[in-house]
A protein has these predicted regions:
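Flexible, solvent-exposed coil segments and beta strand-coil junctions
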Residues: 38, 45-53, 99-109, 187-196, ...
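Extracellular loop and loop/strand-boundary signature of outer-membrane beta-barrel proteins
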Residues: 45, 55-57, 72, 107-113, ...
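Cleavable N-terminal export/targeting peptides
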Residues: 1-49, 267
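Residues on the lipid-exposed face of transmembrane beta-strands in outer-membrane beta-barrel proteins
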Residues: 60, 69-75, 123-129, 148-152, ...
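Outer-membrane beta-barrel transmembrane domain signature
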Residues: 145-229, 234-246, 250, 263-265
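Outer-membrane beta-barrel translocator/channel fold
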Residues: 89-122, 126-137
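Residues that define the transmembrane beta-barrel architecture of outer-membrane proteins
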Residues: 52-56, 63-67, 81-83, 117-121, ...
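Short loop/turn motifs that connect adjacent beta-strands in outer-membrane beta-barrel proteins
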Residues: 48-54, 76-84, 131-142, 220-229, ...
Length: 267
């Protein structure tokens, strides 16, 4: 009985060591297979064969005057050129926006003079050109992107909730309404900023065009998963001036720099 227990204990304690020894070749084989696959792609590209013909990615974008998200579908035309189709949704802030809140009342933060939330929705096409690539190490691929398209500017009314003696105590007002004087005097009426669902019933749309240029740094070109950063400039022009802030000049033309983190998959 004792001999059986000793034998069983020896087997149990030796299992991790056996498992470790068996997993080492597996890990090594996987690395070797990946290295061989990358080398095969590099040799194929030297002969003009495209490693991945298309990709899809999602990005988080920070502009100098806002933020947003983007979606992209790309098609490789050659090892050096690709066509990109992009959809970007963002919120553009005015430089004079200042959030105010009071410690005396639990109201939502309020921006005095803000007239509208401004949401540009851009749909466009870009051309991508390979600028540099450390292909022998599956390193960083550097590419330049140039393009543009249409932009639809959505204006959501900025509704402010204030104290009002003519209603049940509190009332939502906006500048483009008969209550414009109360909107202007909101600071003296215990104001509260709008919630996420306020102002959509007074949505307005302004069409426009945009142009964009950028440089993209794609890490691991021969990996199926895309992991990249992009920096660039973009300009937008709308068919009429965009009212964003009270007592400030309205603009038709917007120019900004941006930084984006992008993730996706190649096929």
């Amino acid at each position: 009985m004792k001999q059986s227990l000793i034998l069983l204990a020896a087997i149990i304690f030796s299992l991790p060591a056996i498992a470790q020894e068996t997993t080492k070749p597996v890990k090594k084989n996987r690395k070797e297979e990946k290295r061989e696959r990358i080398n095969a792609m590099i040799r194929a590209e030297e002969e003009g064969v495209i490693a991945y013909k298309k990709h899809f990615l999602f990005g988080i974008k920070l502009n100098t005057d806002g933020y947003g998200i983007l979606f992209e579908k790309g098609y490789a035309k050659s090892i050096r050129k690709a066509t990109l189709f992009q959809l970007a949704i963002s919120e553009r802030k005015h430089q004079k926006e200042i959030k105010q809140s009071s410690f005396l009342t639990p109201n939502s933060p309020f921006i005095y003079g803000k007239l509208n939330f401004f949401y540009p929705i851009k749909l466009g096409v870009q051309k991508q050109f390979l600028l540099g690539n450390k292909s022998n190490k599956n390193g960083v691929m550097i590419s330049g992107n140039v393009g543009g398209g249409i932009s639809l500017g959505l204006l959501r009314a900025y509704e402010v909730e204030i104290d009002d003696s003519t209603s049940s105590g509190r009332k939502s007002v906006r500048y483009d309404s008969p209550d414009s004087l109360k909107f202007v005097d909101a600071l003296n009426r215990n104001p509260s900023g709008p919630g996420l669902f306020k102002g959509w019933s007074h949505l307005k749309m302004t069409p426009g065009l945009y142009a964009k240029t950028a440089v993209r740094f794609d890490y691991g070109r021969y990996n199926e998963l895309v992991s990249a950063i992009e920096v660039g400039l973009e300009a937008e022009f709308y068919s009429k001036k965009i009212p964003q802030m009270l007592y400030n000049k309205e603009k038709q033309f917007f120019f900004s720099a941006f930084f984006a983190l992008e993730f996706g998959k190649r096929k």
